[in-house]
Amino acid sequence: MEDEPTYPSFRQSLLVTISLCLTLFCVSLDETVLATAIPRITDQFQSLNDVGWYGSSYLFVFTATQMAWGKLYTMYPAKWVFLTGVTVFEVGSLVCGVSPTSGALIAGRSIAGLGAGSINAGAVLIISNTIPVQKRPIYLGCLGVVHGVVSVLGPVIGGLLTDHASWRWCFFLNLPIGAITVLGIVFCLSTNQPSAGHLSGKEKLRSMDLLGSAFFIPGILMLLLALEWGGSQYAWDSWRVILLFVLSAVALAVFAVVQVRAPEKATIAPRLVTNRNMLGLIGYIVGNSGGLFVFVYYLPIWLQAIKEFSASKSGLAILPTQLGMVAASLAGGILVTVVRYYTPFLIVSSLLAVAGAGLLSSLHPASGLGSILGYQVVLSVGIGLGAQNAMVVPSVVCAPGDVVMAIATLCFLQMLSSSIALTLAQTVFHSRLVTNLAHRAPSVDSALVEQGATRLRDRVPADLLPSVVGAYSQAVSETFYVGVAMCALSLLGSASMQWKRVPGHKEATEKVEGEGQGQGQQQEQDQGQGWGEVGESHALAHPTADK
């Protein structure tokens, strides 16, 4: 009989959990805190064209590296891998806080995203190593509560810091919290023995999807650059933009071939994306996640530039989006538990999201507060209704051994779609702003308007201001069309899924017992690939995995 695992004392476990919660507070805050600070940042750096990069740089690097971090946790002690990630994240926060230019801020966001990829996976793994299994759900629930609360309060915190201190404190805030975390982990967490720690250096390298990453990361970067440059710095038919699109397509095609030829260490398992229900679910997740981020980032810009809201007030004004999602997510989980079918709720979720996105795209300078708040409720209830239920689907439509990998794949594509959607939205915003100004106020140089979001009225003559404000508002509304299109994609995805019944307790037990042996073997393989920690970290630390 195997020896019972030895766990730290309650005091040590509590201190470690507090340290993990503080770190997740910083990472979760970084996802939404900039939403209300960005307009002020664009004023200081005169960088309205970089809005998309402030979010997409963080999200893309986070997404591209999280699988590698998950793998490292199986090879090296979790304590030191986690501390490495925290250190990288803190360095990125420091770079953001002291950044003298927009480019430096984007670089800092990328560095922070690199470290954040380690923190989500590591927090769940460390809890698993330090807390007895019977008490684990409570501690894991604490991680989920932290993410949920911070997701709601992030824009408000960002607005308050921007108005009463400086937008730089959105990043400086992470530094003392990170220092406390490092001390807690160093002195309270013991070093574990990783499952793949016995492998040689060559074997560790061979087990990672380095070849796939070598094509995937440049492929997505070239796609983002093409979307960013097209129609703004260069014409869509310029050789630079065309070349980037072609090279991106080639790199991503090679990445797909690598995934098919080496499925045992694939970043995206081919057998999952060829499953009809999983493919529909991917469309649903990608659409709603990408659409949500467009509104989270551009609605505060509209509120501050057009309605003259302060950063703090705009943070309060977008609370319906955050609160509605949390409430609808809880309600959706209860409804599916009772009805036992998730597909109808995913379809209703998509329909409401499309309706809410369409309503928000109709906002204009004369729109009242009731419309602004009410339209957000429709969107947030739509997206929130399916947030938790989407993560139930893999347990129903996938083999038991594929569930963890499926959840990790969904979270991977979810974050990636948010990054791409923000870049595409930025391109639409810039091109439509230039076009609208040329039509409504041809005598106004678009460069003046593009220098910042909140000083619009300081740079434009009073007699031309109504025309310029109208052009600006129309450009944001047309940017919201990207969100509408993304939500429509989610509708196509949910409508294509079969109506599968969520098994009851007895049925689920029989399924697990019947396939238990295959599940154990497959999960061991997935854990070895770093999928286990990453999948669980998103499902538990991100209970509303749509931010």
Swiss-Prot record:
Lineage: Eukaryota, Fungi, Dikarya, Ascomycota, Pezizomycotina
Presence of keyword Aminoacyl-tRNA synthetase: no
Keywords, ordered alphabetically: Membrane, Transmembrane, Transmembrane helix, Transport
Record CDD domains: MFS_Azr1_MDR_like
Transmembrane segments: 14-34, 50-70, 80-100, 111-131, 138-158, 169-189, 210-230, 238-258, 279-299, 316-336, 343-363, 366-386, 392-412, 475-495
Function: MFS-type transporter; part of the gene cluster that mediates the biosynthesis of the unguisins, gamma-aminobutyric acid (GABA)-containing fungal cyclic heptapeptides with the amino acid sequence cyclo-(D-Ala1-D-Val2-L-Phe3-D-Val4-D-Ala5-D-Trp6-GABA7) for unguisin A and cyclo-(D-Ala1-D-Val2-L-Leu3-D-Val4-D-Ala5-D-Trp6-GABA7) for unguisin B. May be involved in the secretion of unguisins.
GO molecular function list: transmembrane transporter activity
Superkingdom as given in the UniProt entry: Eukaryota
Protein name listed in UniProt: MFS-type transporter ungB
Gene this protein is translated from: ungB
Biased composition (Basic and acidic residues): 504-514
Bridged cysteine pairs (disulfide): none
